[in-house]
């Protein structure tokens, strides 16, 4: 059985960060639903797998909300355009991290928490780990500092299950056309992102399911 966030300890919760530090998370508070997140590099097939899972759950009678980060609120849509559009020019790594976490805070307040409190299953395409991997490891910022910022933005809400779709950057690049600003960041950037995702999964224990994403969607 997947452990529920509503049984979190009432005090602070911490786990090891990707570079050996501690990622501190405050209590997530009561919630009745189930929170599932898909993570992975660009080109891993997250959107396809999110849709397949949601269809399967709905066919079994579950009330499912599909969402994504960034961009699933009005504010998030503005932020998504800023951080992904090649026309945005040079954005400093710290500014980028702050923008992604602003999206995250609004997304949790407006979309995720209300749905969980209604008892719904929330399936999100990206969440905190993407911010740690991309804006932390990818942009060579402190992973622990980015993790703490994301924990503050989300009030420490931890998914019940994180599905990490793992694909090597070369294979992922072959799948992508019309690349956005993040997808065009370069091979070394995407290698750091992948390595950090795998490190987060290794340290995160039973909450993670790592799935090789070199396969087709049906496999």
Short names for language-model regions:
Residues 49:
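Hydrophobic positions on the alpha1 helix immediately C-terminal to the Walker A/P-loop
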